């Protein structure tokens, strides 16, 4: 089965939608406008207290697969790394990707997760230097919008022609390969390179091998131009790829430009161009005795004269990082250049930003801490996918992950969790913010002793830590903790809120959802957004239209009219019909007795009954609910309920 066929056969994938569509920002929360406004006011004032969330359960970016990325194993297509994963999955343990760190250097980091999905409505970005990126509209690139503005992450959909996208110019090689290369140990071994794999191997080699490979590439594929620039012409299956040459040049601090020309309607000629000043530097590197330089272990960066070039170059060739320098782009023959030759970033003008009406499988990586990786045929800094709680996003922005600890008390209940994990996180050092956040879900599952220990911890670390506790029942949280928190009580979601998000998800997943199917989902959810989303995903697995019949079948929920028929028959004295309808719900529909009680309670005031009869029905429902809760037989109690209604006539 092809990838497209597989996608059509299983439109819902293997993702868990309640995680996929969990609100990432306060603006994404449906149906709790007043609570969101209060929370936002704390954040706007930079005065976040301890918080206690109480309420019922359930209230409350990417590139295409052919995109090459720089890893500790060389250049690999991201589609090969992620594979056929749908949604998030753990990343391979031995994988590292090249990422831009906060101090402006490039390092190799372990990604925590990989991500894959089908997506339509892509965005294509083209630059003056020949870079072409096809990404989802929300995927972010590092952009500078004007001459004197700082770089910011901008979604692809908001990028326009004239902006400057930042690309990697000085790339390190992985620390484990620095100084040696299993495939090519010295320059003599690259004297005859017959295919792309050898070039790829030399990309991860020591400086001797990389410089020797570049020398061979110049001999075989390059020509000097009248303006002093150098042009590599690549055509045919046995020439190195554009990405290999571009990345190889970037490991020695040289930015390149890519152009392509279609000839004979079927053959494409690619060219890699480096400007005159970088050509001179490359020639100096080729003439340098790198064995002597490496032996001296020179690491001093000096940029005051041309004679210092070898010292400067060696420092970023032999380490896992690069120097950080300011840069100001200026035009020279259509190519933008950094203000100094040692800047790790290169500014490239966006020429085209266009929407594509196409559907493709897209991929991403999550790199903790730095949240970016180097990718593209010409190395470009790209943002990665991430998700977190809305408040952490609002307070810390992109730095939420280093300042948030999430625990679930129902999984890890007891006093040891409070004493160990929470205290260790609260004590660990951090900088740049007044406090960190510890989020404890289902806090009402903690024992009283654990809550007492938590209260002492909240007091001890009040200066640098804020706690957010979530629970279903605030009455199960001890008073000393409640008194230290701003309490937010989340009400069950309205039908309008559930209807709105359910429709949005159906549209995002290309699901045909009928109006009666939507009504059934809202009814079955009963104010629980998680149940609505789970029910929608379950109904969509059939690959058919999600209608009323599908929803009631999937959720084992009785239609409101079936409940009304049963109750009305009992009140009219037709116990036989009422009992038969009850049997249908228990046996054919597969409902539990407790679920029938819940539906009776929810629909009592919507039935066409007078007030006295409704009160009597609710009284009987309460009695049956209590008896079933303490262990009585469900069918016996429900039949007794119907009999009592019939007996009053």
Curated annotation (Swiss-Prot):
One Pfam family named in its UniProt record: Rep_fac_C
GO biological process: DNA repair; DNA-templated DNA replication; intein-mediated protein splicing
UniProt xrefs under CDD domains: AAA, Hint, HLD_clamp_RFC
Residue sites binding ATP per the record: 55-385
Sorted UniProt keywords: ATP-binding, Autocatalytic cleavage, DNA replication, Nucleotide-binding, Protein splicing
PROSITE patterns, per the entry: INTEIN_C_TER, INTEIN_N_TER
CC annotations in GO: DNA replication factor C complex
Keyword Nucleotide-binding in record: yes
Modification(s) after translation: This protein undergoes a protein self splicing that involves a post-translational excision of the intervening region (intein) followed by peptide ligation.
UniProt xrefs under InterPro entries: ATPase_AAA_core, DNA_pol3_clamp-load_cplx_C, DNA_Rep/Repair_Clamp_Loader, Hint_dom_N, Hint_dom_sf, INTEIN, Intein_C, Intein_N
GO MF terms, alphabetically ordered: ATP binding; ATP hydrolysis activity; DNA binding; DNA clamp loader activity
Subunit details: Heteromultimer composed of small subunits (RfcS) and large subunits (RfcL).
Function: Part of the RFC clamp loader complex which loads the PCNA sliding clamp onto DNA.
Assigned protein family: Belongs to the activator 1 small subunits family. RfcS subfamily.
NCBIfam families referenced in this protein's UniProt entry, alphabetically: intein_Nterm, PRK00440.1
Name of the protein this chain belongs to: Replication factor C small subunit
Organism: Haloquadratum walsbyi (strain DSM 16790 / HBSQ001)
This protein's encoding gene: rfcS
């Amino acid at each position: 089965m092809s990838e497209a066929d597989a996608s059509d056969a299983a439109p819902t994938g293997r993702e868990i939608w309640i995680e996929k569509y969990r609100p990432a920002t306060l603006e994404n929360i449906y149906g709790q406008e007043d609570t969101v406004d209060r929370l936002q006011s704390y954040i706007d004032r930079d005065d976040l207290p301890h918080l206690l969330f109480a309420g019922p359960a359930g209230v409350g970016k990417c590139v295409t697969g052919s995109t090459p990325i720089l890893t500790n194993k060389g250049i690999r297509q991201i589609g090969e790394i992620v594979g056929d994963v749908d949604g998030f999955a753990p990343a391979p343990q031995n994988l590292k990707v090249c990422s831009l760190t906060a101090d402006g250097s490039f390092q190799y980091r372990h990604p925590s997760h990989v991500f894959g999905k089908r997506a339509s409505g892509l965005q294509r970005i083209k630059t003056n230097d020949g870079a072409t990126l096809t990404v989802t509209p929300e995927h972010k690139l590092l952009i500078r919008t004007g001459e004197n503005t700082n770089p910011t992450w901008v979604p692809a959909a908001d990028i326009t022609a004239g902006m400057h996208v930042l690309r990697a110019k000085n790339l390190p090689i992985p620390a484990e390969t620095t100084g040696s290369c299993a495939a090519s140990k010295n320059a003599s071994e690259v004297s005859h390179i017959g295919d792309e794999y050898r070039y790829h191997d030399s990309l991860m080699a020591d400086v001797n091998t990389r410089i020797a490979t570049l020398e061979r590439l110049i001999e075989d594929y390059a020509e000097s131009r009248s303006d002093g620039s150098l042009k590599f012409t690549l055509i045919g299956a046995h020439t190195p790829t554009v990405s290999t040459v571009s990345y190889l040049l970037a490991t020695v601090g040289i930015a390149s430009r890519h152009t392509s020309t279609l000839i004979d309607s079927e053959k494409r000629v690619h060219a890699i161009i480096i400007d005159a000043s970088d050509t001179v530097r490359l020639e100096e590197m080729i003439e340098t005795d790198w064995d002597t330089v490496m032996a001296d272990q020179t690491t001093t960066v000096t940029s005051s004269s041309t004679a210092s070039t070898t010292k400067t170059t060696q420092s970023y060739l032999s380490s896992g990082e690069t120097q950080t320098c300011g840069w100001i782009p200026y035009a020279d023959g259509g190519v933008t250049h950094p203000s100094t030759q040692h800047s790790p970033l290169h500014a490239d003008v966006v020429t085209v930003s266009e929407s594509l009406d196409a559907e493709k499988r897209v991929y991403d990586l999550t790199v903790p801490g730095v949240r970016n990786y180097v990718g593209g045929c010409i190395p470009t800094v790209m943002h990665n996918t991430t998700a977190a709680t809305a408040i952490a996003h609002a307070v810390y922005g992109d730095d939420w992950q280093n300042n948030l600890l999430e625990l679930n008390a129902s999984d890890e209940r007891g006093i040891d969790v409070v004493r160990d994990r929470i205290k260790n996180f609260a004590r660990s050092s951090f900088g740049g913010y007044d406090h960190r956040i510890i989020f404890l879900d289902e806090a009402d599952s903690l024992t009283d002793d654990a809550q007492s220990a938590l209260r002492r911890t909240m007091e001890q670390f009040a200066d640098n830590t804020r706690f957010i506790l979530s629970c279903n029942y605030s009455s199960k949280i001890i008073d000393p903790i409640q008194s230290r928190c701003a309490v937010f009580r989340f009400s069950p979601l309205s039908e309008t809120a559930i209807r709105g998000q359910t429709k949005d998800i159906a549209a995002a997943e290309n699901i045909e959802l009928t109006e009666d199917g939507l009504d059934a989902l809202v009814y079955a959810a009963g104010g629980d957004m998680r149940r609505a989303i789970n029910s929608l995903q379950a109904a969509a697995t059939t690959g058919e239209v999600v209608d009323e019949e599908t929803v009631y079948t999937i959720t084992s929920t009785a239609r409101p009219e079936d409940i009304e028929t049963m109750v009305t028959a009992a009140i009219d004295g037709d116990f036989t019909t009422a009992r038969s309808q009850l049997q249908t719900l228990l046996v054919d529909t597969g409902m539990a007795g407790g679920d029938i009680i819940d539906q009776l309670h929810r629909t009592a005031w919507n039935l066409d009954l007078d007030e006295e009869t409704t009160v009597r029905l609710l009284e009987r429902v309460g009695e049956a609910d209590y008896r079933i809760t303490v262990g009585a037989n469900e069918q016996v109690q429900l039949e007794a309920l119907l009999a009592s209604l019939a007996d009053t006539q």
